[in-house]
Regions:
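Extreme N-terminal tail/first-helix region
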Residues: 1-20
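Charged, gly/pro-rich active-site loop segments
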Residues: 2-3, 79-159
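Amphipathic alpha-helical interface surfaces
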Residues: 14, 62, 114-117
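Short N-terminal helix-initiation segments at or just after the protein's N-terminus
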Residues: 14-18, 36-52, 83-95
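Short, intrinsically disordered, mixed-charge
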Residues: 19, 59, 67-72, 123-127
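Short beta-strand segments
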Residues: 21-58, 74
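Helix-adjacent hinge/juxtasegments
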Residues: 61-84, 92
Length: 159
């Protein structure tokens, strides 16, 4: 990380960034080409291990890529506004916080593990619990888990 003074290492601050964000961009490698998709997500962060969950249709381009190469790169960011630089364009900046890292997308197969992952995702997205997921709905839904092998967090906070 070039701007090491912006690094965030405190687990509670990392959780706060993740809690504020609702969309994650997942980058895939489609043969030699990048392919990036925005998705809603949920997460667990325990003992310095960050695990991300998202869902997808069972078939489609994302799933085809994952079968060939499950390596992904995830970015999560929160935008906090433009820092006005006056008349000097090079003095402008942006207030933000972000978490990003590399991992492998694993497709969950059992309905119970899908339900557990969807509970995490739905609680993150809505703040609510107690959702019902029918077996027929789950059969048409791919649920993916990405344990980040390494990740970084940084922020440029408003003063």
């Amino acid at each position: 990380m070039r701007r090491s003074e912006r690094a965030v290492t405190d687990p509670q601050m990392i959780r706060e960034i993740l809690d504020r964000a609702k969309v994650m961009h997942v980058g895939f490698v489609d043969q030699a080409d990048p392919y990036v998709v925005p998705v809603n997500f949920g997460y667990t962060y325990e003992d310095d291990v960050l695990t991300l969950y998202f869902n997808s249709a069972v078939t489609g381009h994302k799933m085809d890529i994952i079968k060939e190469n499950p390596t992904v790169f995830c970015t999560i960011s929160v935008q906090d506004g433009l820092k006005d630089g006056g008349d000097n364009a090079c003095s402008f900046s942006y207030y933000y916080a972000s978490v990003m890292g590399k991992g492998r997308a694993l497709r969950l197969t059992g309905n119970e593990e899908k339900r557990a992952a969807l509970d995490i995702l739905m609680k993150h997205q809505t703040g609510r619990e107690g959702f019902v997921y029918g077996d027929s709905s789950l059969s048409r839904l791919a649920v993916l888990k990405v344990k980040l092998e390494n990740f970084t967090a940084k922020m440029n906070p408003k003063a």
